[in-house]
């Protein structure tokens, strides 16, 4: 058995694309080898400057293959049959027949001879390289090949020899290169073992997983050495492993003056911009240290540390300057600047949006002064220096500025959390923050729908589906007894619009169905859904439990039987007890009369479980009615009266849910 070693050596591959490339090339090569009857064990390694394929257990020759090719039916015109024979260079006598769906077809068995693997590998490799689709790729120079970054070299060795491979302007060889900064020299290799060893000798760790383990171990060791804690950050570890060929973890210091910055600012400066790891003391407070990953082993590590400390100090100095500039002004004093910030070309500026949000909050919770204050100030930090530098800190900086001004925690927290939830995995805000988040998201969604930005099958540029789910989650997880239909009407009035109500309510209904269908049957959802979402969820849960029980199943069957008897007939008029001629119909009507007011009261109290239990009292008399009474009596008055009785029962059930949809 033979082995194949392929290295695509390039300029720096973006770290966030490396893992996908590793998985993508592994799948592609595995599939293409299998399709070519080459059954090999395939491994792919990825790093900042190289993607490496290592395949083992390759045979030296392919096994003979047989492929059965279907031709025309035996009843086809002779010209079609001759054309098939000509296309495959065979005579009609060489064809076999096979019965498919009671029809005989001609078949030709195509046989391929065994071939040396090294003859077919170049074509397979080029096909596999081209098959992977990068999220972004580029041409460079006058070359005709396209890749994520300019390719500089291709190493390709099969069975100890260079495989004659041509990819664009590059010809395969047996050369690789060491670490770009410390050992950037040509390395001749003979096989995979030699390749991996020489890379390691020249400060390149081939395996991404191994680089990540080195980083994890280094982070923990240095954190423990200072008696500090480090928060687990798998995503950042993966990213820095994609930035370094030979990771070395080092410890730097932060000047004490910078610790007066909010911790989110420190984290944003260090993690997002510098790819540094934050450290905390045992009480959870920010420690004046940071960890970073150096790309390579350098003789003077202290110089590397000082350089990184200097870079971080410069960034934090800017942040501290912005912070002090910001706290010199109140949030209210920034409101005028919001007039210069466009929310949407058709919807006005952020100052106008603030007025809408405030009006909605006042509609939801009249006389809630803290909520109204938070609503008026919730967007002020968007025109601050700090949020201009760190957009992800919107809301968070508003919280700190509100606290600095002396506003209470309820107001500050509402400003901070009013963007929540920002996705399915994000938590929902509570208290005033939930009401403010609801008002903000609702105003955005209603306004953007009016502006013609409704989602389509091809896109949702303003993430309105996510906004709607956020609103639904806020209402349900906070058990807000609000009618979304009323809120939509009120929000539309703020834009002087009422024409788009049906569009928006339909959109919310579809999103509510999407939300509920993870837990409930779609038929049940269709039977109870309205835009009082808390009530809808309560009905769903109650009905789901009830319909599992025997009584629930029997009641549903009784409803369907009554509904089928009524059919499309329009039943009018009250039930006339004097027309009853049988005991079962008298008994049924008596139960209906007795339980109806109790059911109506239970529904008004949202006690749906009691209402359903009361409906269960219908089971015995309605079964007797169906067994012993002819509904469509020859006397039309009697028939109409019995139909009216069944209609009453159906209407009673439909007060809880649309049973005709179950």
Curated annotation (Swiss-Prot):
Q: Name one GO biological process term.
A: arginyl-tRNA aminoacylation
- Cite the SUPFAM superfamilies for this sequence: HD-domain/PDEase-like
Q: Which UniProt keywords apply?
A: Aminoacyl-tRNA synthetase, ATP-binding, Cytoplasm, Ligase, Nucleotide-binding, Protein biosynthesis
Q: Which reaction does it catalyse?
A: tRNA(Gly) + glycine + ATP = glycyl-tRNA(Gly) + AMP + diphosphate
> One GO CC term of this entry?
cytosol
Compartment list: Cytoplasm
Q: What is its EC number?
A: 6.1.1.14
What GO molecular-function term can you cite, just one?
A: arginine-tRNA ligase activity
Keyword Zinc-finger attributed:
no
For whether the record's keyword set contains Coiled coil, the answer is no
A Pfam family name for this chain? tRNA_synt_2f
InterPro entries from the xrefs? DALR_anticod-bd (IPR008909), Gly-tRNA-synth_bsu (IPR015944), Gly-tRNA-synth_heterodimer (IPR006194)
Please describe the quaternary structure of this protein: Tetramer of two alpha and two beta subunits.
Q: Which family does it belong to?
A: Belongs to the class-II aminoacyl-tRNA synthetase family.
Family annotation (PANTHER family): GLYCINE--TRNA LIGASE, CHLOROPLASTIC_MITOCHONDRIAL 2, GLYCYL-TRNA SYNTHETASE
**NCBIfam families from the xrefs?**
glyS (TIGR00211)
- Record-given protein name: Glycine--tRNA ligase beta subunit
The organism named in the record is: Rickettsia akari (strain Hartford)
- Gene assigned in the entry: glyS
């Amino acid at each position: 058995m033979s082995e194949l070693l392929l290295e695509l050596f390039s300029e720096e591959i973006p770290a966030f694309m490396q893992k996908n490339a590793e998985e993508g090339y592994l799948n592609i090569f595995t599939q293409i080898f299998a399709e070519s009857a080459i059954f090999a064990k395939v491994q792919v390694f990825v790093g900042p400057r190289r993607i490496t394929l290592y395949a083992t257990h390759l045979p030296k020759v392919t096994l003979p293959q047989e492929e059965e090719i279907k031709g025309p039916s035996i009843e086809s015109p002779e010209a079609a049959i001759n054309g098939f024979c000509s296309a495959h260079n065979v005579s009609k006598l060489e064809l076999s027949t096979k019965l498919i769906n009671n029809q005989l077809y001609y078949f030709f068995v195509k046989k391929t001879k065994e071939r040396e693997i090294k003859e077919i590998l170049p074509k397979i490799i080029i096909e596999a390289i081209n098959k992977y689709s990068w999220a972004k790729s580029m041409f460079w120079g006058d070359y005709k090949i396209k890749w994520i970054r300019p390719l500089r070299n291709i190493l390709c060795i099969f069975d100890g020899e260079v495989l004659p491979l041509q990819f664009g302007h590059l010809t395969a060889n047996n050369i690789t290169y060491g670490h770009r900064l410390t050992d950037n020299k040509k390395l001749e290799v003979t096989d995979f073992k030699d390749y991996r060893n020489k890379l390691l000798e020249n400060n390149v760790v081939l395996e991404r997983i191994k680089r990540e383990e080195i980083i994890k171990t280094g982070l923990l060791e240095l954190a423990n050495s200072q008696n500090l804690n480090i928060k687990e950050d798998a995503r950042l570890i993966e990213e820095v492993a994609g930035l370094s060929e030979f990771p070395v973890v080092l410890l730097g210091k932060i000047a004490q003056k910078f610790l007066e910055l909010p911790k989110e600012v420190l984290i944003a400066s260090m993690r997002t911009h510098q790819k540094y790891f934050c450290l905390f003391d045992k009480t959870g407070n920010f420690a004046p240290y940071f960890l970073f990953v150096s790309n390579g082993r350098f003789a003077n590590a202290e110089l590397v540390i000082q350089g990184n400390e200097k870079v971080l100090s410069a960034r934090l100095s800017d942040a501290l300057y912005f912070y002090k500039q910001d706290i010199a002004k109140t949030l209210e004093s920034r409101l005028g600047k919001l007039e210069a910030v466009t929310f949407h070309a058709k919807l006005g500026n952020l100052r106008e949006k603030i007025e809408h949000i405030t009006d909605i909050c006042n509609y939801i919770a009249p006389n809630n002064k803290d909520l109204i204050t938070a609503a008026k100030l919730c967007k002020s930090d968007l025109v601050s220096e700090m949020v201009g530098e760190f957009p992800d800190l919107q809301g968070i900086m508003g919280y700190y500025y509100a606290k600095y001004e002396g506003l209470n925690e309820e107001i500050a927290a509402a400003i901070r959390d009013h963007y929540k939830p920002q996705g399915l995995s994000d938590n929902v805000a509570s208290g005033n923050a939930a009401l403010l988040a609801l008002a903000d998201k609702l105003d955005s969604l209603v306004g953007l729908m009016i502006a013609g930005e409704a989602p389509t099958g091809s896109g949702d540029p303003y993430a309105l589906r996510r906004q709607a789910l956020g609103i639904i989650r806020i209402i349900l997880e906070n058990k807000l007894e609000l009618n979304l239909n009323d809120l939509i009407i009120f929000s539309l009035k703020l834009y002087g619009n009422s024409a788009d109500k049906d569009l928006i309510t339909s959109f919310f209904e579809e999103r509510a169905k999407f939300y509920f269908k993870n837990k409930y049957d779609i038929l049940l959802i269709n039977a109870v859904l309205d835009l009082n979402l808390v009530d809808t969820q309560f009905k769903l849960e109650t009905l789901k439990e009830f319909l599992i029980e025997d009584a629930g199943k029997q009641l549903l069957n009784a409803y369907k039987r009554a509904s089928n008897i009524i059919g499309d007939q329009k039943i009018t008029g009250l039930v006339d007890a004097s027309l009853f001629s049988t005991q079962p119909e008298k008994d049924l009507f008596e139960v209906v009369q007795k339980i109806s007011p109790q059911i109506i009261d239970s529904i008004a109290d949202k006690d749906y479980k009691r209402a359903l239990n009361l409906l269960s009292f219908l089971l015995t008399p309605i079964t007797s009615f169906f067994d012993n009474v002819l509904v469509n009596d020859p006397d039309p008055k009697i028939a109409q009266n019995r139909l009216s009785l069944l209609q009453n029962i159906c209407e009673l059930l439909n007060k809880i849910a649309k049973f005709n949809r179950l």
